[in-house]
């Protein structure tokens, strides 16, 4: 039996807000969180901008747990707890083996790694903190979510750069469809506002000096940010049996690889992933009302994504609404497509397409309707989310209203 998978809870933190509701409110209105980075340890950067979570929400995680967590893991746990709360779920001895988690992480614990470097090489110490190794591993986020919520089913991480969260969600859907779990926490987390990470991205010459302007002719690159987004996924039967509110259904998944270049984008991979997603969801191109674009704000990525969208959707590419919410929350790497999942689900819930903020000049090479600067009321029955990662790893998800 092909089990349907629905979303019953959302959680998130990023520069826009510290829960899914506040993130969506800011995103919907096109209010960008991009601004100066306040971390005093970050210096000598050409562009000192990003999206930071200024103050974390109150939580019940004690100090003994916190010392074993890098920031990206903490963000994942906080988002997961929010999602479980909205879903009205909790783990116990009777159901824990049917609850699991997959968390996408792009970079992982570079904060712990950089602190170890400073301690050993600059401070002259002979050893690092006890938990440096386990704090830094990308899978730590999934481990910490499991331990903090008591999940004993399938638990693992997904690491595919900017597509990590979509790959994690896709994998979680598979666990439910295969009957290995009834409930999965899925999403992504990253905390890349660390000096060594920012310097690495600066070296690639892709960071914008001012802000992120996806699809605008005067765009100058991407902006990095920290954040996490998590969803509670359930089999339709499990959610219906307990009378849960179903926010959306995960209708389809499309995965592909460019097999082309470690950094440069290509058209054929994104095109293949979008086509595969439509087939998996049994959708026609005309069924998609809203597409949340990968839309990083770099010259090459936005142009190539536009071309891929035109190839897949044909004439409908000019009828559906498109936007890049990275213009508001920036590129949160492993968390990016998790935050964009929130945008898709809430667009379906409220019938509003969030805009592409900071847009100034039309680009003839990006000539689709990217919903510039102002939200648009529109019935959204189906929303698609693109995630195209460095190295050509592509993951596309389709979400739809629950009948």
From Swiss-Prot:
GO cellular component: plasma membrane
Cysteines engaged in disulfide bonds, as pairs: none
NCBIfam families: PRK07314.1
Subcellular location field: Cell inner membrane
Residue intervals of the Ketosynthase family 3 (KS3) domain: 2-401
Keyword tags: Cell inner membrane, Cell membrane, Membrane, Nodulation, Plasmid, Transferase, Transmembrane, Transmembrane helix
SUPFAM superfamilies with a match to the protein in the record: Thiolase-like
PROSITE patterns: KS3_1, KS3_2
GO MF, any single term: 3-oxoacyl-[acyl-carrier-protein] synthase activity
Documented EC number(s): 2.3.1.-
Name assigned to this protein: Nodulation protein E
Enzyme active site: 162, 294, 331
Highest taxon of the lineage: Bacteria
A single GO BP: fatty acid biosynthetic process
Family, similarity comment: Belongs to the thiolase-like superfamily. Beta-ketoacyl-ACP synthases family.
Transmembrane segments: 329-348
Record lineage: Bacteria, Pseudomonadati, Pseudomonadota, Alphaproteobacteria, Hyphomicrobiales
InterPro entries for this protein: Beta-ketoacyl_synthase, Ketoacyl_synth_AS, Ketoacyl_synth_C, Ketoacyl_synth_N, PKS_Beta-ketoAc_synthase_dom, Thiolase-like
Function: Proposed to synthesize NOD factor fatty acyl chain. Involved in the synthesis of a highly unsaturated fatty acid moiety, which forms part of a lipo-oligosaccharide that is responsible for host specificity.
The keyword Cytoplasm is annotated on this UniProt entry: no
A Pfam cross-reference name: ketoacyl-synt
């Amino acid at each position: 039996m092909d089990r349907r998978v629905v979303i019953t809870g959302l959680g998130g933190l990023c520069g826009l807000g510290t829960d899914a509701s506040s993130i969506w409110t800011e995103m919907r209105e096109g209010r960008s969180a991009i601004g100066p980075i306040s971390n005093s340890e970050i210096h000598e950067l050409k562009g000192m901008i990003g999206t930071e979570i200024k103050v974390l929400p109150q939580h019940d995680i004690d100090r003994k747990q916190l010392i074993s967590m890098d920031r990206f893991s903490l963000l994942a746990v906080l988002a997961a707890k929010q999602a479980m709360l909205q879903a009205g779920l909790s783990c116990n001895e009777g159901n824990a083996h049917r609850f699991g988690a997959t968390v996408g992480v792009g970079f992982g614990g570079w904060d712990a790694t950089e602190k170890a470097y400073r301690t050993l090489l600059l401070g002259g110490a002979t050893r690092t903190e006890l938990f440096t190794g386990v704090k830094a591993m990308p899978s730590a986020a999934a481990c910490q979510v499991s331990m903090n919520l008591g999940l004993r089913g399938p638990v693992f991480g997904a690491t595919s750069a900017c597509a990590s969260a979509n790959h994690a969600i896709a994998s979680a859907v598979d666990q439910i469809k295969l009957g290995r779990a009834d409930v999965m926490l899925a999403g992504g987390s990253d905390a890349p506002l660390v000096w060594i990470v920012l310097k690495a991205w600066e070296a690639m010459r892709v960071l914008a000096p001012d802000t992120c302007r996806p699809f605008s002719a005067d765009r100058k690159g991407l902006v990095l940010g920290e954040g996490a987004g998590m969803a509670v996924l359930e089999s339709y039967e499990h959610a219906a049996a307990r009378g849960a509110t179903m926010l959306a259904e995960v209708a389809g998944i499309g995965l592909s690889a460019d097999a082309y270049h470690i950094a440069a984008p290509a058209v054929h991979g994104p095109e293949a992933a979008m086509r595969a997603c439509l087939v998996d969801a049994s959708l026609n191109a005309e069924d998609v009302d809203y597409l949340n674009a990968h839309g990083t704000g770099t010259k090459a990525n936005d142009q190539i994504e536009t071309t891929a969208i035109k190839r897949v959707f044909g004439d409908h590419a000019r009828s559906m609404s498109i936007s890049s919410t990275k213009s508001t929350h920036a590129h949160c790497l492993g968390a990016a497509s998790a935050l964009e999942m929130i945008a898709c689900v809430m667009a379906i819930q409220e019938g509003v397409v969030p805009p592409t903020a900071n847009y100034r000049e039309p680009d003839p090479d990006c000539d689709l309707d990217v919903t510039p600067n102002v939200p648009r009321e529109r019935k959204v029955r189906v929303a698609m989310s693109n995630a195209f990662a460095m190295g050509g790893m592509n993951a596309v998800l389709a979400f739809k209203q629950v009948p």
